[in-house]
């Protein structure tokens, strides 16, 4: 006889199912489960008197016969492709199955076999996302990495050599010597890493040698001189060696205007950093480049979202990061030219329309490395409050908006930088970089961070307590963040030409590594749920932004979710 159970009782036991709705933390964002693959009445769950026991939900099969290393039971997946309830199987550090876990000898529809070799993570009541990708990192200090991991970021791409003056301002690891040292340093960190070389050179040989030394991309930055000639040279090398180019354009318009930069790019694929312009770029109209089909536009998080405090904090940040002197009027004028209320307000709306594709941090260089995910969903919340439901959504849920915004920090930066074969989504075959969130803490404090199939970070109580939960409970690094466990669970991303040249062997790298691929034939249309290409115009006098003739403006937020309610500091 089938047994009927109330939705509330079912959700409390196995987590929410199809049709159930969840409020995300203290935002106004509502998620609704679209599908459930766990089979009612045949769910697996670990614990005393529960299902995953020998001869019941646990099979007699061996690992060699298909048993997974880890099963995450009854997980609610939020990804660009859907919002579904499912079990997740992990084997050899990769996602091996999404669907129904258990024992095929006693249960039907099992595609994830649980056995004696299987560890269990309870996903009931948790939301699972792919580990976030921060594609705008200034590697100023190594402590950034723990802070990023604690927030749910598992991949960091950028440049730098430490707190050098150049690194404080630009995301470049210049030259083979510094690239080699950073690749060797990466061996000790429990996240995926990749480093950008300096792209500011008209001599192509100076750029090629950096890519062949191990750079996974090149960065053009105005502080090194982003001239049309440098842009053309850098993109030519990138096309030859299949790496992405990131650009911070010429705020002062010394070498040309935004139209000249677009002309120099010549339709080639490029990732434009902080495309609104407060972080740097042609003043006042770099934002119009987000309508170009070959441009992948991103934001950095200090302007996410537009608040009462956004403008005030930017001036001092800018002066420090770009080595400017407040006693020099020209330096102050340079800084002030980048900070515009009108373009920052428009940036909010362009994200909601899917015209801006990526959000990153700009870590310690006008951005906060631990706030990529929280700022993303603060923006989503603000836009729901100010603009209402998206046309693709309804009064029951914000599913399309949630999928659009999660894509900005997961799959889209992965595609942009040629690493989507390995990371960026919860899909079979990809590295098991997964973040588990309790709904009340979604976007602000992960419960667990799984890195390459092993727990790298978790909320953990007093180590001297008799159980794991006594206070003080806070995020702490776990076993796979230490020792040689880092090597098989984390990837270092290199150019394919560097791998062919034997860089990992020459530098005696022990970490797993992978090449970046297919960065040059992608376009704005490759961006999941964020491929809108409106025609952008900026009034040169008022700085008002228009998309397809419509004025884009919104008020600054006075109060935000995912903020002081959750944080003591």
Curated annotation (Swiss-Prot):
Assigned protein family: Belongs to the metallo-dependent hydrolases superfamily. Urease alpha subunit family.
Co-factor requirement: Ni cation
Domain Urease: 131-569
Example GO molecular function: urease activity
Binding site for Ni(2+) 1: 136, 138, 219, 362
InterPro entries: Amidohydro-rel, Metal-dep_hydrolase_composite, Metal_Hydrolase, Urease_alpha_N_dom, Urease_alpha_subunit, Urease_AS, Urease_asu, Urease_asu_c
Residues holding substrate: 221
Gene label: ureC
Name of this chain's protein: Urease subunit alpha
Native source organism of the sequence: Prochlorococcus marinus (strain NATL2A)
Location in the cell: Cytoplasm
PROSITE patterns per record: UREASE_1 (PS01120), UREASE_2 (PS00145), UREASE_3 (PS51368)
């Amino acid at each position: 006889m089938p047994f009927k159970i109330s939705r509330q009782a079912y959700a409390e036991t196995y987590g929410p199912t199809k049709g159930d709705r969840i409020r995300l933390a203290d935002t106004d964002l509502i998620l609704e489960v679209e599908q459930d693959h766990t089979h009612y009445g045949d769910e697996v769950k670990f614990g005393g008197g529960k299902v995953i026991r020998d001869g019941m939900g646990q099979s007699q099969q061996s690992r060699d016969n298909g048993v997974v290393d880890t099963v995450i039971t009854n997980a609610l997946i939020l990804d660009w492709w859907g919002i579904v309830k499912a079990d997740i199987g992990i084997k050899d550090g990769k996602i091996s199955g999404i669907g129904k876990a258990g024992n095929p000898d006693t249960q039907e529809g099992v595609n994830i076999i649980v056995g004696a070799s299987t560890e269990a993570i309870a996903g009931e009541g948790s939301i699972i996302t792919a580990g976030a990708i921060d594609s705008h990192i200034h590697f100023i200090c190594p402590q950034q990495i723990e802070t990023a991991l604690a927030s749910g970021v598992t991949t960091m791409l950028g440049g730098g050599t430490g707190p050098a003056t150049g690194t404080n301002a630009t995301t470049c690891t210049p030259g083979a010597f510094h690239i080699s040292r950073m690749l060797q340093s990466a061996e000790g960190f429990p996240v995926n890493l990749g480093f950008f070389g300096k792209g500011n050179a008209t001599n192509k040989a100076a750029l090629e040698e950096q890519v062949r030394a191990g750079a996974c991309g090149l960065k053009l930055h105005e502080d090194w001189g982003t001239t049309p000639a440098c842009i053309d040279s850098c993109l030519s090398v990138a096309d030859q060696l299949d790496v992405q180019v990131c650009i911070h354009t010429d705020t002062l318009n010394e070498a040309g205007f935004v139209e000249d930069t677009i002309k120099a790019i010549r339709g080639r694929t490029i990732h434009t950093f902080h495309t609104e312009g407060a972080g740097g770029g042609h003043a006042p109209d770099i934002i119009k480049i987000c309508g170009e089909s070959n441009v992948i536009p991103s934001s950095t998080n200090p302007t996410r979202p537009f608040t009462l405090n956004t403008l005030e904090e930017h001036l001092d940040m800018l002066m420090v990061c770009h080595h400017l002197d407040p006693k020099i009027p020209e330096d102050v004028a340079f800084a002030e030219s980048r900070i515009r209320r009108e373009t920052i307000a428009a940036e909010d709306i362009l994200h909601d329309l899917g015209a801006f594709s990526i959000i990153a941090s700009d870590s310690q260089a006008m951005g906060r490395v631990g706030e990529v995910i929280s700022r993303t969903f603060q923006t989503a919340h603000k836009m729901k409050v100010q603009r209402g439901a998206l046309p693709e959504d309804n009064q029951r849920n914000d599913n399309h908006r949630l999928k659009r915004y999660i894509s900005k920090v997961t799959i889209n930066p992965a595609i942009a930088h040629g690493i989507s074969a390995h990371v960026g989504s919860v899909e079979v075959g990809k590295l098991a970089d997964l973040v588990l969130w309790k709904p009340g803490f979604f976007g602000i404090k992960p419960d667990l961070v799984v890195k390459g199939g092993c727990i790298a970070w978790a909320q953990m109580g007093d180590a001297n307590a008799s159980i794991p939960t006594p206070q003080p409970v806070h995020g702490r690094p776990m076993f796979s963040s230490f020792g040689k466990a880092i090597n098989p669970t984390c990837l270092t991303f290199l150019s394919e030409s560097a791998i062919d040249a034997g860089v990992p062997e020459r530098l005696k790298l022990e970490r797993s590594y992978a090449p970046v691929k297919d960065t040059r034939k992608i376009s704005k249309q490759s961006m999941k749920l964020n491929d809108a290409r409106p025609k952008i115009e900026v009034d040169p006098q008022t700085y008002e932004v228009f998309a397809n003739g419509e004025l884009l403006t919104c008020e600054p937020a006075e109060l935000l979710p995912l903020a002081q309610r959750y944080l003591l500091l």
